[in-house]
Every structure is written in structure tokens, then in C-alpha cells.
Amino acid sequence: LIGGVTASLPVFTGGQIVYGNKLAKVNEEVSRLKHRQSENEVRLTVEQYFWQVVMLKEKLRTLSTVQEQLKEIHKDVDAAVAAGVTDRNDLLQVQLRKNETQSSYISVENALNVSRNLLGQYIGHMADSIDVAVTMDGSLPNRPDELYQSPEASLASTSEYHLLGKQVDVSHLKYKMTVGKNLPTVAIGGGYMYDNLMDHSHPFWIGSVTVSVPLTKWWSGSHDIKQQRLKVRNSENQMADQRQLLIIKMQNTWNAVTDAYKQVEIAIESIGQASENLRLQKDYYQAGTCTMSDLLEAQSLY
């Protein structure tokens, strides 16, 4: 009767175990970064739907103001036609403009309903159960210059840049693991043996040290190492390229923000000028020194 139990423990595997554990940790960090990136994308989409609703509601409010103005103009022109001061052509021009405004109002109202439905669907609510209560008071927030940070300094706060760095870390670890697969491995072992021959029992302990040299893998292994080294270089080059693209993207976004702020400044100034122009054109029309086309043009600019 012969029996026994043996066990072995790897002492050196070319770093495969160590680098494998590090690779697992890096993959966990990648998962967290992707999760954060997804959250940011969801927030951005919700904000886009939100401000789309706000914009359309402001358009409706503007069109309502225009409709009230046209209603007053129509009333005045109708009275002028009845008094024989002007002809019906002016009245028809006002009526056509009223129809155009009503058509625009219907289109914007439909677009608002669609945008509200999209917002509700995205956040998991029925469209008729949500509304956006934001009123634009015509004032500007603080200048965006107060929030400016250079794109280079902002890279560290972006998930995209961190993901690029993790991809480089993964390629380095995989390269080291590939090298480790072609290095000798050392393992220690021990066991307990028992034999009973010719009615003589003979139990004993054994110990061993095993060194394995992957001779048959040297050729294919060297090819794998070269291939993995190229992947490391590719990941580093990709990170450098994507870094520049991220900087350009952030700079373009900043330019869009500053341009939009300047456009709003110009628009606020233009509102006052257009309001005064409309008032003057009304006076000129009533005095008979301008045409209905001039008055309607001033009204459309307002």
C-alpha cells in the first residue's frame, strides 16, 4: 500500500501574479471612471432637454407679446380704414402678419410638447406630470471669465483623460505579464508519503524546489513581447493625440460660451433699440409719414 499528499506553492512566476492583481485593480478603476462618465452624460442630456424646454417657452412668450402688439395694430388700422384714412391693403398686411405669427406659435407649441415629452421620458416621468418653471428676467449672469481655467489645467478633472491614462497603465501591465510568462518559475513544495510493503509501514515527509524554464516558448514568447511593446507605444501615442484633441475641444467649448455671452449682451442692447424704433414707427404711421410695411418691419425686429 502506497499513498501520499503533496502541495506546491509558486514563489516566483515572473511577476505574473503581482501584475495580474494590479491589472485587476486598474480595471476596477476603469469601471468606476466609465460609470462617472455615464453619469455626467446623463446629467448633460437632462440639462439639454431642460434648457430646450426653457428656450421654447420663452419663444412662446415672445410670440404672445407679438400677437398682442399685432392685435392693437389691427384694431388701430381697422379704425383707420373705417374712417377712410387708409386703405384695406394695410389691414390685409396686418392680417397676414397675424396669421404668420399664429402659425409660428403653433409650431413652437408643438415643439415644446415634444421636448417636454423627451425630458419626461428621459427622467422617468410622464410628460403631463412635469413642467419647467424658469423665467428669464433679461439680466445677465456674471461674466464667464470668472470661471475660466486653462484646458491644460482642466484635463485632470475629466474622466476622459483619466481613462486614457488607465489604458496606458493596462498596456504596461500586460507587457510586464507577457515578459513574466517567458521567465523561469520557481515553486516550493512539500508532502507526506506513506507506504506499507511487506508488513512494514514507512511514513515520511518530503520537500521540493521546482524550477521551470520555458525553453519551448522562447521564440513565440519573444514575438509576443515585441507585439506587446508596440501596443504600449500605440497607447502612449494615442494618449498624446487624444490629450491634444481634448484640449482643442475644451477651448472650442469655451469660445462658444464666451461668444454666446457676447451675443446675449448685444441682444439685450438691441431690445431697447428695437422697442424705441417700434414706438417711433407707430407715431410715424399715425402721422402718415411711414408705411404699414415699415411699421410691421419694426414690429418684427422687436
Feature map (PLM): residue ranges:
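Hydrophobic core residues within well-ordered beta-strands of beta-rich domains
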Residues: 3, 49, 205-207, 253
